[in-house]
């Protein structure tokens, strides 16, 4: 009997820029329609979500701007397009909720992460509202003050 392969666990790729540029209000888990070479590349961790976003059209969700680099050992008879649009698999209720929210001014749908869920690759997408420049500065100030507070609490325990 063949030995079972263990699938890699955890996150494949993250979009840290999206968390910086948007107030994340609601998250969804979506499946992806992938071809064989894309799954091989994702197993190797060769994916980027930096400028990716989700577009809703004709009652379907599509992932744009995600970059999956093809492996050199991948199949040669398939032309690999690293930046092709990929269909996202969501429930009808989730799609309707996303479409209603995106129709409101200021809301957008972005991809946050690609990760393994058992033997499947999932995409975490989020409904977000764009941050203004002063919002980004406020977030940075708040993060710095929390870091200083944690540092002070840690150092207070060492002095005693």
Curated annotation (Swiss-Prot):
It comes from the Bacteria. Keywords: Cytoplasm, RNA-binding. The keyword NAD does not apply. One of its GO terms (biological process) is trans-translation. InterPro entries: SmpB, SsrA-bd_prot, SsrA-bd_prot_CS. Its main location: cytoplasm. Residues 136-160 are annotated as: Disordered. It is found in: Cytoplasm. Belongs to the SmpB family. Required for rescue of stalled ribosomes mediated by trans-translation. Binds to transfer-messenger RNA (tmRNA), required for stable association of tmRNA with ribosomes. tmRNA and SmpB together mimic tRNA shape, replacing the anticodon stem-loop with SmpB. tmRNA is encoded by the ssrA gene; the 2 termini fold to resemble tRNA(Ala) and it encodes a 'tag peptide', a short internal open reading frame. During trans-translation Ala-aminoacylated tmRNA acts like a tRNA, entering the A-site of stalled ribosomes, displacing the stalled mRNA. This is SsrA-binding protein. The lineage of its organism: Bacteria, Pseudomonadati, Pseudomonadota, Gammaproteobacteria, Pseudomonadales. The gene is smpB.
